[in-house]
Amino acid sequence: MRDLKTYLSVAPVLSTLWFGSLAGLLIEINRFFPDALTFPFF
């Protein structure tokens, strides 16, 4: 039961960090390449 509580307390923290970094990455891409439907570096 203790392992389940540890998992349930770690998963929200990791998902918050993951989605926060993903949102930051998308914001920075949109800052350098505004309104890009296709990215020019591909």
Swiss-Prot record:
It is a single-pass membrane protein. The chain crosses the membrane at residues 7-27. It holds the Pfam family PSI_PsaJ. Keywords: Chloroplast, Membrane, Photosynthesis, Photosystem I, Plastid, Thylakoid, Transmembrane, Transmembrane helix. SUPFAM superfamilies: Subunit IX of photosystem I reaction centre, PsaJ. Its main location: plastid. One of its GO terms (cellular component) is photosystem I. It is found in: Plastid, Chloroplast thylakoid membrane. InterPro entries: PSI_PsaJ, PSI_PsaJ_sf. May help in the organization of the PsaE and PsaF subunits. PANTHER family: PHOTOSYSTEM I REACTION CENTER SUBUNIT IX, PTHR36082. Belongs to the PsaJ family. This is Photosystem I reaction center subunit IX. It comes from Gossypium hirsutum (Upland cotton). The lineage of its organism: Eukaryota, Viridiplantae, Streptophyta, Embryophyta, Tracheophyta.
